[in-house]
């Protein structure tokens, strides 16, 4: 009987056994007193009862013998794990006595024992199966309280024993009638199960072609439908037999989870992954909702970010463990009755090279198709994410533009002088771009500042190098022109007339060509776009006055007055005051480090420095660096006049603002003595920014905050070999 591997179908003895099954108190008395004294009550029931009890005793003795043989086999095979045998003993003691003396337990033991002897490598699988069966038929703790309570009551009140015996016999009779009534259903379900198993085996033996995969009635789909029906029949049969439907598969094992430090969250996640029903794989959203519910119900007080981190860690851990369980279930249950006799050393692909090559080709094809499917949906996901990102950027830009509209309307309003302030068309774009960059991230702003500092340092180095070269050229020219009088008005500029005066002349185009950028911030600054005809006329007037030999200072002052708006043109009284100040300033001796007089702001190739004084903004970073390098000296309180000139293709545009001595006046860099020329103004050569006069500062409205402005000069566009300034040495 022990070596029998087939499933034994229950015979009519089980019906008699179930019919003659005693109450809960009788099975406990039978094992304790198996002698002839206990056989008295059974003899009173007749010959049928004695035969049933005899069959039960035979089953029990046989089951005990089979269980001992299985334990001996486990001792030999599981010497590395000695705790296996005591664990099996404990489970047997906790099992129900009726189940231990049943034919079902005998069939399970015989099957497990025979398979363990044939396949010792899978011994632990069969041990697990036996443990699952014993746990399913173990005595529950709640059921153990009833016999104890009845025993106490029987001890205290002996006359109540006969009614309890009557109730036990009544329940036994009802159970026997119910069992006899469902006997026919059980037999019918068993026949259906056998029929389904035979049909499934027949379908598994059929060859499946690739063309049949799309057929809705293919053998593979028929087999899947029959297996689902078989599972439902098995569950119904277990309900009728009042036994557990667990089969010991890995997929049925409960997964304990202790991944977080919060027991409430652990219990919620464990309940989620061990939910009864189909093996569903929870996604990140399910885990996050479970964590949030646990935190809300138990008032954990965790922030949103920490809940997300907990959910992410739990999702990774749970996903790995569920994948491992599915993989093990696939390994244990893969195949069919055709692969039951498979051994690792008898693979036909090891001896047949054609089959091995075909299997490798099929595997390569399967992996390539799998990669195509994965890449397809990965690209679809990337496209959807990119589309969402672009929509988000569009919304942010729309909101930023809507917030910039009131600012632009306030900036375009009328100033205190009654004239609408106009802005340079290049500045709003730069300001909006800077604001967007500031709103996006501060790192980009720091990188831009570093790049600007590097660019200004490179420009300073280029300017210094060009200044040294020009100084050498000026010294050579000064040696050749010593015979000329320093006071005689010599021609200063020799300029080539442009053949095409109609070439686009605008301040914006000129600044783009020469690399100049400015940010006006007050209504006192010049309008951004003078007409080309005005620029040409101003250039012609400048050329005529230069040829007539007029003083450059007067020329520059008159052109400056013409360029300024009407409200900013000084009255005759103010002109007299400014002229008196200019005379007093010119009468004061200004001392340089080498004792030379100050000269005009003339560029290296004969042009006037193109750094327009725009507003009362604080000095730029470059100017602060120059001021630090300058340090305290004799020029700290000197009077410096900045002259600015911007060359256009059709003429010259010059603006001059005088800066008298004031606490607000900034100190320009010290010019080298080699840059001195014979000029009527006798002022310092400088190319730094200038501050406006106090009168202009007072006219600036207090409500308008000064804006920083950066002026960049491209040295490469200034050095024109055809425009030469003839310099003379004043010494």
From Swiss-Prot:
<keyword id="KW-0539">Nucleus</keyword>
<dbReference type="GO" id="GO:0000122">
    <property type="term" value="P:negative regulation of transcription by RNA polymerase II"/>
</dbReference>
<feature type="compositionally biased region" description="Polar residues">
    <location>
        <begin position="398"/>
        <end position="412"/>
    </location>
</feature>
<keyword id="KW-0156">Chromatin regulator</keyword>
<feature type="modified residue" description="Phosphoserine">
    <location>
        <position position="617"/>
    </location>
</feature>
<feature type="coiled-coil region">
    <location>
        <begin position="177"/>
        <end position="215"/>
    </location>
</feature>
<feature type="modified residue" description="Phosphoserine">
    <location>
        <position position="25"/>
    </location>
</feature>
<dbReference type="GO" id="GO:0140416">
    <property type="term" value="F:transcription regulator inhibitor activity"/>
</dbReference>
<dbReference type="GO" id="GO:0000775">
    <property type="term" value="C:chromosome, centromeric region"/>
</dbReference>
<dbReference type="GO" id="GO:0030295">
    <property type="term" value="F:protein kinase activator activity"/>
</dbReference>
<feature type="region of interest" description="Necessary for interaction with USP7 and ATRX">
    <location>
        <begin position="1"/>
        <end position="158"/>
    </location>
</feature>
<dbReference type="GO" id="GO:0072738">
    <property type="term" value="P:cellular response to diamide"/>
</dbReference>
<dbReference type="GO" id="GO:0005634">
    <property type="term" value="C:nucleus"/>
</dbReference>
<feature type="modified residue" description="Phosphoserine">
    <location>
        <position position="211"/>
    </location>
</feature>
<keyword id="KW-0597">Phosphoprotein</keyword>
<protein>
    <recommendedName>
        <fullName>Death domain-associated protein 6</fullName>
    </recommendedName>
</protein>
<keyword id="KW-0158">Chromosome</keyword>
<dbReference type="GO" id="GO:0005938">
    <property type="term" value="C:cell cortex"/>
</dbReference>
<dbReference type="GO" id="GO:0043066">
    <property type="term" value="P:negative regulation of apoptotic process"/>
</dbReference>
<feature type="modified residue" description="Phosphoserine">
    <location>
        <position position="551"/>
    </location>
</feature>
<feature type="modified residue" description="N6-acetyllysine">
    <location>
        <position position="503"/>
    </location>
</feature>
<feature type="modified residue" description="Phosphoserine">
    <location>
        <position position="661"/>
    </location>
</feature>
<dbReference type="GO" id="GO:0002039">
    <property type="term" value="F:p53 binding"/>
</dbReference>
<dbReference type="GO" id="GO:0071356">
    <property type="term" value="P:cellular response to tumor necrosis factor"/>
</dbReference>
<dbReference type="GO" id="GO:1903936">
    <property type="term" value="P:cellular response to sodium arsenite"/>
</dbReference>
<dbReference type="GO" id="GO:0000792">
    <property type="term" value="C:heterochromatin"/>
</dbReference>
<feature type="modified residue" description="Phosphoserine">
    <location>
        <position position="693"/>
    </location>
</feature>
<keyword id="KW-0007">Acetylation</keyword>
<dbReference type="GO" id="GO:2001235">
    <property type="term" value="P:positive regulation of apoptotic signaling pathway"/>
</dbReference>
<feature type="region of interest" description="Interaction with SPOP">
    <location>
        <begin position="617"/>
        <end position="731"/>
    </location>
</feature>
<dbReference type="GO" id="GO:0070301">
    <property type="term" value="P:cellular response to hydrogen peroxide"/>
</dbReference>
<dbReference type="GO" id="GO:0006338">
    <property type="term" value="P:chromatin remodeling"/>
</dbReference>
<dbReference type="InterPro" id="IPR038298">
    <property type="entry name" value="Daxx_N_sf"/>
</dbReference>
<feature type="compositionally biased region" description="Acidic residues">
    <location>
        <begin position="432"/>
        <end position="482"/>
    </location>
</feature>
<dbReference type="GO" id="GO:0042803">
    <property type="term" value="F:protein homodimerization activity"/>
</dbReference>
<dbReference type="GO" id="GO:0006355">
    <property type="term" value="P:regulation of DNA-templated transcription"/>
</dbReference>
<feature type="short sequence motif" description="Nuclear localization signal">
    <location>
        <begin position="391"/>
        <end position="395"/>
    </location>
</feature>
<dbReference type="GO" id="GO:0042393">
    <property type="term" value="F:histone binding"/>
</dbReference>
<keyword id="KW-0143">Chaperone</keyword>
<dbReference type="InterPro" id="IPR031333">
    <property type="entry name" value="Daxx_N"/>
</dbReference>
<feature type="modified residue" description="Phosphoserine">
    <location>
        <position position="527"/>
    </location>
</feature>
<dbReference type="GO" id="GO:0008432">
    <property type="term" value="F:JUN kinase binding"/>
</dbReference>
